[in-house]
Swiss-Prot record:
Keywords: Cell inner membrane, Cell membrane, Electron transport, FAD, Flavoprotein, Membrane, Oxidoreductase, Transport, Tricarboxylic acid cycle. Part of an enzyme complex containing four subunits: a flavoprotein, an iron-sulfur, cytochrome b-556, and a hydrophobic anchor protein. Its EC number is 1.3.5.1. GO terms for cellular component: plasma membrane. Substrate binds at H246, T258, H357, R402. The active site is at R290. GO terms for molecular function: electron transfer activity; flavin adenine dinucleotide binding; succinate dehydrogenase (quinone) activity. The modification Tele-8alpha-FAD histidine is found at H49. It is an enzyme of class 1 (oxidoreductase). It comes from Rickettsia felis (strain ATCC VR-1525 / URRWXCal2) (Rickettsia azadi). It catalyses: a quinone + succinate = fumarate + a quinol. This is Succinate dehydrogenase flavoprotein subunit.
Length: 596
């Protein structure tokens, strides 16, 4: 089958797949270290979804009041509901201030205080004095377009350091030999050629799989391509049952209203005009952790206190804030609310509803970004030649629930750490290990089979079925009955993939084929998500079970590892959470009841 296609071969020291915040920080970091670096991306780099990140990036700079990276670590561990690995969380929080200053030096146009320091706003779950003090102003912001500012700056740095970009190239599969990754096969959408990239290290920075759900803040390109490739390579994914619902997606549109809106003083109300978060989180109120706020909103709606004709959403009030604050600190939100909700935020509340926003789960890695698998003794062993960073990865710094503004931090800290590790492991221009023709043939055969699929089901119809099933069966609240039913339905939908129909057989700009390949990636991840959720019989972070309402550390303080074997069977395994710190600069944070 390889002879039927024009395959172009390349050799690089490193290939990064994805050009969002994590991918670009990794790519130029590696190029800066003297490694011949390629960056493959299915869309132009500055269209990557990092551009949509609004509220900010967290670091204990202390510009707006006393702060300490140890407090930041405590909040992150608590936010993770004690499922985050404390060594990785320490690494991230300790390196956060330097990461921000590095971004500033690269040219990120952060908003400023009157003294000229980087402006920091409060965000959910961020406190001082190990949770005993007041809310921390820790989230560094560039108005409400922080991701946009960071992504453009990182792209400029990538060009400066001569990263070779392959733009509008779609990654098909990893080249694996003897349990090692030796490259990646991709499809050039512009001219229809297939490319075999050989590399000493492949970095997956492909983002999350939010589009497995019907309503998500994610772009339609967020199809978890890295996770799909990892599953097909026989690797497990970690903690996939933990899907974050952002409290404030615009009702019916799903577009994000940043948590920064509540950080600036916005608040939620029900049909009675009551600020209901005071009942659920008396101390933090509207700035409780995202899973807490999303559940509170869902309960209000369920109990008949929702607003609107169908009583199926709540209101976010910003109209008490001065127009000057809205214009200077939340300009994008004002525009988004006007376009997608028809609301003037200076006069009217915004209709909002919890919306799928972030995947805490992903490809398991250590804090160097190296992909890890569990060996027979419950220890981790590294998959040679393969790294994963950003939302595609599970380090795990977010555990069962991510704190707002820790995601942009995750991107730059672990993007940088992956580059440093790669430079340590790889000698520039060293010879590549061989690959078997059969490995390449297998990838091309799968691609060709999908391309010539001539069944009865349209890709769009099957995708919609999956999205609606995930929305109804793996949502904010879950039960065994609903999850088991969802697992059966997603399995059936995945089986339906064998009967898809591709109308366009061409190789140049074939969006029908792109969407079919993306759907394959989404279906595998949807499947392991719902099976992992059905297996975890407790409530922790974003995984809220009505039939098991309490956290159960004795049985369930462990990471889920889920994979799909060659027969298509779901395999669920577990490994311990790392409860020890990296250094003695801070003691391990013992599990406690999570109250805001």
């Amino acid at each position: 089958m390889t002879k039927a296609y024009n395959i172009i071969h390349h050799k690089f020291d490193v290939v990064v797949v994805g050009a969002g915040g994590a991918g670009l920080r990794s790519a130029f970091g590696m190029a800066k270290e003297g490694l011949n670096t390629a960056c493959i991306t299915k869309l132009f780099p500055t269209r990557s979804h990092t551009v949509a990140a609004q509220g900010g990036i967290s670091a204990a700079l202390g510009n707006m009041g006393e702060d300490d990276w140890r407090w930041h670590m405590y909040d992150t561990v608590k936010g993770s509901d004690w499922l985050g690995d404390q060594d990785a969380i320490e690494y991230m929080c300790k390196n956060a201030p330097d990461a921000i200053l590095e971004l500033e030096h690269y040219g990120v146009p952060f908003s400023r205080t009157e003294e000229g320091k980087i402006y920091q706003r409060p965000f959910g779950g961020m406190t001082t004095e190990y949770g005993k003090g007041k809310a921390a102003q820790r989230t560094c912001a560039a108005a409400d377009r922080t991701g946009h500012a960071i992504l453009h700056t990182l792209y400029q740095q990538s060009l400066k350091h001569k990263v070779q970009f392959f733009v509008e190239y779609f990654a098909i599969d990893l080249l694996m030999e003897d349990g090692e990754c030796r490259g990646v096969v991709v499809w050039n959408l512009d001219d229809g050629t297939l490319h075999c990239f050989r590399a000493h290290n492949v970095v997956l920075a492909t983002g999350g799989y939010g589009r497995a759900y019907f309503s998500a803040t994610s772009a339609h390109t967020c199809t978890g391509d890295g996770g799909g490739m990892a599953i097909r390579a026989g690797l497990p994914l970690q903690d996939m049952e933990f899907v974050q619902f952002h409290p404030t997606g615009i009702y019916s549109a799903g577009c994000l209203i940043t948590e920064g809106a509540r950080g600036e003083g916005g608040y939620l109300v029900n049909a009675n005009g009551e600020r209901f978060m005071e009942r659920y989180a008396p101390a933090a109120k509207d700035l409780a952790s995202r899973d807490v706020v999303s559940r509170a909103m869902t309960i209000e709606i369920r109990e008949g206190r929702g607003v609107g004709e169908h009583k199926d959403h709540v209101f976010l009030h910003l109209n008490h804030l001065s127009p000057e604050i809205l214009h200077s600190r939340l300009p994008g939100i004002s525009e988004t609310a006007k376009i997608f909700a028809g609301v003037d935020v200076t006069k009217e509340p915004i209709p909002v509803l919890p919306t799928v926003h972030y995947n805490m789960g992903g490809i398991p890695t250590n804090y160097h970004g190296q992909v890890i698998i569990k060996d027979g003794t419950n220890h981790n062993s590294v998959v040679k030649g393969l790294m994963a960073i950003g939302e595609a990865a599970c380090v795990s710094v977010h555990g069962a629930n991510r704190l707002g503004s820790n995601s942009l931090l995750d991107l730059v800290v672990f993007g940088r750490s992956s580059a440093l590790k790669a430079a340590e492991l790889i000698s520039p221009a060293s010879p590549h290990k061989p690959i078997k023709e059969a490995s390449l043939e297998k990838i091309i055969n799968r691609f060709d089979k999908v391309r010539h699929a001539n069944g009865n089901i349209l890709v769009a119809d099957l995708r919609l079925k999956m999205q609606r099933t995930m929305q109804s069966h793996a949502s904010v609240f879950r039960t065994q009955e609903v999850l088991d039913e969802g697992a059966g339905m997603i399995s059936e939908i995945r089986n339906g993939y064998k009967d898809i129909k591709i109308n366009d057989k061409s190789l140049i700009w074939n969006s029908d084929l792109v969407e079919a390949l993306e759907l394959d990636n989404l279906l595998d991840q949807a499947l392991v998500t719902v099976y992992s959720a059905a297996a975890r019989k407790e409530s922790r972070g974003a995984h809220a079970r009505e039939d098991y309402p309490d956290r159960n550390d004795g049985d369930w303080m462990k990471h889920t590892l889920s994979s799909i074997d060659e027969a298509g069977k779901i395999v669920i395994d577990y490994k311990p959470v790392t409860l020890t710190t990296l250094t003695d600069e801070i003691s391990a944070i013992p599990p406690a009841k999570r109250v805001y």
